Amino acid sequence: MFAEIITIGDELLIGQVTDTNSAWMGRELNKVGIEVIRVVSVRDRADEIIEAVDASMKRANIVLVTGGLGPTKDDITKQTLCKYFGTRLIFSEAVFENVKRVLAGKIPMNALNKSQAMVPEDCIVINNRVGSASVSWFEKDGKVLVSMPGVPQEMTTVMSEEVIPRLCAKFRTDAIVHRTFTVQNYPESVLAEKLESWEMALPACLKLAYLPKPGLIRLRLTGRGQNRSEVEACVNTESAKLEAILGEDILDEEDTPIEILIGELLKKKNLTLSTAESCTGGSIAARITSVAGSSEYFKGSIIAYANEVKTELLGVSMETLEKRGAVSEETVIEMVKGAMKALKTDCAVATSGIAGPSGGTEEKPVGTVWIAAAYKSEICTMKQETNRGREMNVERASNNALLLLRKLVK
């Protein structure tokens, strides 16, 4: 069963608002066997909306439209859909009661807010319990178009409570089963070459996707078919073959973020952690503390951006900084030791590098990062040399630091 998503709003196309709705809908629909095959964003222009709707209705069984349902003049989705489906807007007392309930004590009722009770005549109107814009469900030639508000909280509520259950009741869907493996130690092209024979022999019901992240690659194995048990069995069989090929290079089989894996490992071994960060500027600590319960194992971080902080708080010697430089293996070793000593932890990670876009030299170009991980008296280091832009360099260094720590502690 195929679906297309149309998001409406000038704000999406000028980058003022990020479309998070489509990603959420894609995930939730996939869980029930509905595959999103296209996402289209259009301006608040009637002709462009009609063109997009007409094209989607020809290709897909289900068309989901978000946005343009507000009370102001630039919100034209309802009127435009009426034109497309050959119907008109009528006043709904039931919807008006909901509008009054939602706005009560918050916003005074005026003509614009009352206009929210105008709904297409030839459609099923679905109540929106968390907002004033109702949902319109159209059917034509065995296909369905659903128009929903673009406000994420409202859209997710009506999709979860009303739209998805109705779609499942109306359409027969295939079973879709995913298994995602997080793989370390491979560039994408090298991994693809290693898996070529296995991938070529995959059954027709399975599909493999490569999803690179900084320092990691996620392999998503997707099975699709009418019988869930058969699809799951097929996915399990091929997953076992993949595990045999990659062995310990598979970091995780549930697409679990590395910071969660680190937390689970530290709690299991009853260990504490600290970080000493220069070029990563606290991003490692931020990831660790984003996990609920991280206070059980994480003590703190020293952001040693300046050399004087490295010396005064972490005990890095001036001799090391002068002879080897801040971006060096020797410096991160002293930083990681200093973090463990200052914060009294069992483990620590340290980073120092040139994130960019400037600051690089011929000897140490932009993207050069030294990373150290320590577990009690044992220390290991690595040098990161790939330049992918400042943001990506920092993310990659954060990933590599946590991966290095996991390898050391595990």
Curated annotation (Swiss-Prot):
InterPro entries: CinA, CinA-like_C, CinA_C, CinA_KH, Competence-induced_CinA, MoaB/Mog-like_dom_sf, MoaB/Mog_dom
CDD domains for the chain: cinA
Protein family: Belongs to the CinA family.
Cross-referenced HAMAP family: CinA_B
Protein name: CinA-like protein
